[in-house]
Amino acid sequence: MRITPRRLAIGMSLWIPNFFNGIRVKRFSADWTHATVEMHVNVFTRNSVKTGFGGSMSAMTDPYFFMLLMHQLGRDYVVWDTRGEIEFVKPGRGVLTAEFTVPRAKAEEIRERAHGGAKV
Protein backbone atom coordinates (compact mmCIF):
# COMPACT_ATOMS: atom_id res chain seq x y z
CA MET A 1 0.00 0.00 0.00
CA ARG A 2 1.38 3.39 -1.03
CA ILE A 3 1.35 6.07 1.63
CA THR A 4 -0.68 9.08 0.56
CA PRO A 5 -0.37 12.57 2.03
CA ARG A 6 -3.78 12.19 3.69
CA ARG A 7 -2.93 8.81 5.24
CA LEU A 8 0.38 10.11 6.55
CA ALA A 9 -1.32 13.17 8.08
CA ILE A 10 -3.84 10.95 9.87
CA GLY A 11 -1.17 8.49 10.98
CA MET A 12 1.12 11.24 12.29
CA SER A 13 -1.78 12.82 14.19
CA LEU A 14 -2.52 9.47 15.87
CA TRP A 15 1.16 8.69 16.55
CA ILE A 16 1.48 8.59 20.35
CA PRO A 17 4.08 11.40 20.79
CA ASN A 18 1.95 13.74 18.67
CA PHE A 19 -1.44 12.63 19.97
CA PHE A 20 -0.60 13.19 23.64
CA ASN A 21 1.11 16.51 22.90
CA GLY A 22 -2.04 17.85 21.23
CA ILE A 23 -0.27 17.89 17.84
CA ARG A 24 -2.41 17.46 14.73
CA VAL A 25 -1.09 17.28 11.19
CA LYS A 26 -3.63 19.26 9.20
CA ARG A 27 -2.24 18.37 5.79
CA PHE A 28 0.61 17.35 3.55
CA SER A 29 0.35 18.76 0.03
CA ALA A 30 -0.19 16.27 -2.79
CA ASP A 31 3.28 17.03 -4.19
CA TRP A 32 4.99 16.73 -0.77
CA THR A 33 6.26 20.33 -0.84
CA HIS A 34 4.22 21.64 2.11
CA ALA A 35 2.88 20.55 5.50
CA THR A 36 0.71 22.29 8.08
CA VAL A 37 0.83 21.20 11.72
CA GLU A 38 -1.09 22.51 14.76
CA MET A 39 -0.57 22.13 18.49
CA HIS A 40 -3.34 22.89 20.96
CA VAL A 41 -1.91 24.39 24.14
CA ASN A 42 -3.84 22.81 26.99
CA VAL A 43 -3.31 21.59 30.55
CA PHE A 44 -1.05 18.79 29.29
CA THR A 45 1.04 20.84 26.85
CA ARG A 46 1.63 24.06 28.75
CA ASN A 47 4.32 25.08 31.18
CA SER A 48 4.07 26.76 34.60
CA VAL A 49 3.29 30.17 33.06
CA LYS A 50 0.50 28.68 30.93
CA THR A 51 2.25 28.98 27.56
CA GLY A 52 3.25 26.18 25.20
CA PHE A 53 5.89 23.86 26.66
CA GLY A 54 9.09 24.07 24.61
CA GLY A 55 9.48 20.30 24.42
CA SER A 56 6.01 19.96 22.90
CA MET A 57 6.77 22.71 20.39
CA SER A 58 10.00 20.94 19.50
CA ALA A 59 8.09 17.69 18.94
CA MET A 60 5.63 19.65 16.81
CA THR A 61 8.35 20.83 14.45
CA ASP A 62 10.90 18.01 14.42
CA PRO A 63 10.07 15.52 11.63
CA TYR A 64 8.34 17.52 8.92
CA PHE A 65 11.17 18.99 6.81
CA PHE A 66 12.73 15.52 6.85
CA MET A 67 9.48 13.87 5.72
CA LEU A 68 8.81 16.35 2.93
CA LEU A 69 12.32 15.93 1.57
CA MET A 70 12.25 12.13 1.94
CA HIS A 71 9.04 11.86 -0.10
CA GLN A 72 10.31 14.21 -2.80
CA LEU A 73 13.65 12.44 -3.22
CA GLY A 74 12.22 8.92 -3.21
CA ARG A 75 13.50 5.52 -2.09
CA ASP A 76 16.91 5.86 -3.75
CA TYR A 77 17.96 8.41 -1.13
CA VAL A 78 18.41 8.24 2.65
CA VAL A 79 17.43 11.37 4.55
CA TRP A 80 18.71 11.93 8.09
CA ASP A 81 17.54 14.72 10.37
CA THR A 82 20.75 15.42 12.32
CA ARG A 83 19.98 18.62 14.20
CA GLY A 84 17.32 21.18 14.90
CA GLU A 85 17.13 24.69 16.26
CA ILE A 86 14.19 26.68 17.58
CA GLU A 87 14.04 30.39 18.29
CA PHE A 88 11.16 31.12 20.64
CA VAL A 89 9.97 34.52 19.39
CA LYS A 90 7.03 34.97 21.76
CA PRO A 91 5.01 32.84 24.19
CA GLY A 92 2.64 30.41 22.51
CA ARG A 93 -0.98 30.34 23.64
CA GLY A 94 -4.10 28.75 22.18
CA VAL A 95 -3.57 26.94 18.89
CA LEU A 96 -0.02 27.12 17.53
CA THR A 97 0.43 26.59 13.79
CA ALA A 98 3.60 25.64 11.92
CA GLU A 99 3.97 25.71 8.14
CA PHE A 100 6.77 23.72 6.46
CA THR A 101 7.82 24.15 2.84
CA VAL A 102 10.51 22.36 0.82
CA PRO A 103 10.28 23.72 -2.74
CA ARG A 104 10.83 21.30 -5.63
CA ALA A 105 13.86 23.32 -6.71
CA LYS A 106 15.51 22.81 -3.31
CA ALA A 107 14.85 19.06 -3.41
CA GLU A 108 16.35 18.90 -6.92
CA GLU A 109 19.40 20.86 -5.77
CA ILE A 110 19.91 18.38 -2.92
CA ARG A 111 19.42 15.45 -5.32
CA GLU A 112 22.10 16.84 -7.66
CA ARG A 113 24.54 17.47 -4.81
CA ALA A 114 23.98 13.94 -3.46
CA HIS A 115 24.37 12.27 -6.86
CA GLY A 116 26.92 9.49 -6.61
CA GLY A 117 26.47 8.95 -2.88
CA ALA A 118 27.94 12.20 -1.54
CA LYS A 119 26.69 13.52 1.80
CA VAL A 120 24.82 16.81 1.61
PLM region descriptions:
Residues 44-64, 77:
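Hot-dog-fold acyl-thioester-processing enzymes
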Residues 68-105:
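Hydrophobic beta-strand-centered segment that forms part of the acyl-chain substrate-binding groove
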Residues 18-20, 32, 52, 60, ...:
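Short connector loops at helix/strand junctions that flank enzyme active sites
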Residues 93, 103-120:
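HotDog/MaoC-like acyl-thioester-processing domains
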Residues 20-25, 82-88, 108-109:
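Short structured motifs
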Residues 20-51:
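Catalytic strand-loop segment that frames the active site of acyl-thioester-processing enzymes
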Residues 55-59, 63, 83-87, 102-104, ...:
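Hydrophobic alpha-helical segments of small multi-pass membrane proteins
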Residues 1-20, 44, 48:
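Alpha-helical membrane-targeting segments
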